[in-house]
Amino acid sequence: MKLVLVSGRSGSGKSVLLRMLEDLGYYCVDNLPLPMMGTLLEQLTGNSELVAISVDIRNMPEKDTELEKHLTNLPKGVELLSFFLNSSDEVLLKRYNETRRLHPLSHSNISLKEAIQLEGRQLEPLAKIVDHYIDTSNLNIYDLNDQVREILLGNIDKELMIKFESFGFKHGMPTEADFMFDVRFLPNPHWEPELRPMTGLDKPVQDFLNQRPLVNKFIWQIENLLRTWLPDLERNNRSYLTIAIGCTGGQHRSVYVTERLAEHFKDGRHKVTTSHRELKNAKD
């Protein structure tokens, strides 16, 4: 089991980092008291190989020796990697003033600035023993994501899951699509009596459409468009991309184009899935 421990000063980006780890497939637990960590890991053994836990000042042990004891006495087979996020007092003060959130150490007789400074002093022992110390004062969420991915995976390229979906406009447009392309202008196999009962998954329909230069040109241009912008979409911390292809009934043209595009993107760099809404609905 690989365990990532996320700690740091409040407002430095711990929750953001935890969401990034969740996108990478980690089972994430926020603000877990350290004495409960061993029990949690034992419960997850065999079920989750990637686990991430965040801790904050409110559930940290008071003694440094107790802290190190929790981090060294882990169940057998657990590989620990720890992060500490920090930001300057000025940046943290600005972030809290902008969000108007309450600092964990704020109370009636202490100011926000004093709470930020107090937390910094109390977390110093932990900051000295972590594997990776990251100052987020001048980082945005994308910069932080790149740093963490490089540490965990050895690269900053994000594996994007791409879903190609066919549909019929007469049955309504899908609401979850990031890109939508209308192929109703392409030659329609529906008007060929022998092809009408078939779908874009059948070879006669595929041969009919593959012989049309307009169809191949359209597929080529859509592929180029997507490949041009995929790197920027990946850098934008996106996990999923849904591309919808629509024709009139969702039986022939959209199905064929969806399959062709999916085939072109199954190059090992991306997880690609296909879905044919109207064909599925017909079966149901």
UniProtKB/Swiss-Prot annotation:
Purpose: Displays ATPase and GTPase activities.
Sites where the protein binds GTP: 56-59
Chain residues that bind ATP: 8-15
UniProt name for this protein: Nucleotide-binding protein swp_0674
Listed HAMAP family: RapZ_like
Family, per entry: Belongs to the RapZ-like family.
Keyword GTP-binding: yes
Molecular functions (GO terms): ATP binding; GTP binding
Keyword line: ATP-binding, GTP-binding, Nucleotide-binding
Species: Shewanella piezotolerans (strain WP3 / JCM 13877)
Family matches, as InterPro entries: P-loop_NTPase, RapZ-like, RapZ-like_N, RapZ_C
